[in-house]
């Protein structure tokens, strides 16, 4: 059985093809192709521009995936697409492409939850059996555990996602979005030597990142490290952040010098990743798990994997993570989750093949897993 998966919930358009042998053998990745919309430094990606990018590239990527997989249309059993969550216009573009292929090829559709796609691909690649899942990306931050055919959310962000926090600080510093702003933050952080105190906000199993972002934006503006316009206008600084800016300048002047861009990136990573380690460890203790699976684009971060590994080993456990081929948004994860659902008899009718920006992880009935 062969499934093709289309992913395009944000700025990455992915097409993947996976084979599940009829004899029950090991699944095999036949193709995994991706193209990214990269916005200029200091800017995020607008939904309309991202959707335009997806519409431009989707046909080329589908053709390239079929060629790489060395299969024809007749070999495909189902077409899987990201139903949500994500950005509206990009999701609509991919859903439209999936519906078009379904009509042209005469194949069944399968709508897939983006997060469930990450989880199932992570389980397949790493072999993790029943881990606590830390799902960290530009749009989502969740701590998840499986129970009774649902992926249950134990904790999550109360405001913005951790990846969004890192990406927006990259915009503040006016650094490149190529290959990804979070990746460039990580590279700068490796050169940082000074830990700057930042707000640390964990509330039970939940966390918050907007206050940390406001604080570090204020520091960057105060030190003249932010983008030119923001440095001049102090865009978006709250009253508390402005006070923090003045206090911090005085503090670091007294200590003999101010932090560098690298120090700020290092400090931001250390703070937000410590928060993620804390809530993940709490979930492990609650369910008695010794496994952690990190999925989502931020899961590629080597420092996050290192910090999580230290915690897990102290508990006699292990951390599982994938490389950028499968951690960053991709089409093969949608194909994997979709084919698992398809094998249980699940399909999405053409008239129901919509998309939604809000599609909770725990809304999905995970029929393919046994208790």
UniProtKB/Swiss-Prot annotation:
Enzyme Commission number(s) from the entry = 2.3.1.234
GO CC terms on record?
cytoplasm; EKC/KEOPS complex; nucleus
Classification lineage: Eukaryota, Fungi, Dikarya, Ascomycota, Pezizomycotina
Q: How is the cofactor bound?
A: Binds 1 divalent metal cation per subunit.
Quaternary data: Component of the EKC/KEOPS complex composed of at least BUD32, CGI121, GON7, KAE1 and PCC1; the whole complex dimerizes.
The broad enzyme category this protein falls into is transferase
Localisation: Cytoplasm; Nucleus
- Sum up the protein's function in the record's words: Component of the EKC/KEOPS complex that is required for the formation of a threonylcarbamoyl group on adenosine at position 37 (t(6)A37) in tRNAs that read codons beginning with adenine. The complex is probably involved in the transfer of the threonylcarbamoyl moiety of threonylcarbamoyl-AMP (TC-AMP) to the N6 group of A37. KAE1 likely plays a direct catalytic role in this reaction, but requires other protein(s) of the complex to fulfill this activity. The EKC/KEOPS complex also promotes both telomere uncapping and telomere elongation.
**Residue sites binding substrate per the record:** 135-139, 167, 182, 186, 301
- Reactions mediated catalytically: L-threonylcarbamoyladenylate + adenosine(37) in tRNA = N(6)-L-threonylcarbamoyladenosine(37) in tRNA + AMP + H(+)
What GO molecular function annotation could you give as one example from this UniProt entry?
Answer: N(6)-L-threonylcarbamoyladenine synthase activity
Where does this protein chiefly localize? Answer: cytoplasm
Q: What is this protein called?
A: tRNA N6-adenosine threonylcarbamoyltransferase
Q: Which family does it belong to?
A: Belongs to the KAE1 / TsaD family.
Q: Which Pfam families match?
A: TsaD (PF00814)
Quote the record's binding site residues for a divalent metal cation: 114, 118, 135, 329
